Amino acid sequence: MGTITSTFTTLLFLTTLALAESPAGTPRINSISYSGSGCPQTQARFSGSLDNPTLTFNHFAIEYPNTVNRTANCQVHMQAQGVSAGWQVSVKDTFVDGHVTLDPGATLDYFSTVYFSSSADDSATSKGQLTNDGSSRIDKAVTLQNHFTDKAWSSCTTSSNDGFGILNINFRGALRNEKSYFEATSETWDFEWRRC
């Protein structure tokens, strides 16, 4: 019984702490656009809110060997308002769903870079890699996660209905070594808030 009580108390504390580490209410996205070879304006669609954002791709596909389309990127430009004073935001994780085909020896490198336009030199990049080290072809659905240990933080909000400036999130995929194919279908992001 003591163990159950202790566990419940710990979970309650962690839940309270998590709730305390985000602004009151949900900031609203008031502007979003995207650019890049993987998401021309007519080939991508955004849905959801800052709590559950989803970017759906219609044209993000790369192939190797291919001198033109072995790499592609999509950069999102986002603004939001409704943040209470005294907060900063960063991107904690990016998740890209898609399908990959890798012959033995082939590699998919994937990168996520985050920065705010007000401080473009202060960027954060996370890299992942998927390699076929086996003897048979890989052909499967994948979720590519990039976690940011070092984060790019927004400036500190100063009013009750402030925004965090222009947030830029760039995802890039690149294939190399052997015959391979990757198609991204959607991207989501997890945000982290802190007091400032």
Regions found by a protein language model. Give the residues of each.
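Fungal secretory targeting signals
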Residues: 1-22
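Mature extracytoplasmic or otherwise solvent-exposed domains
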Residues: 19-196
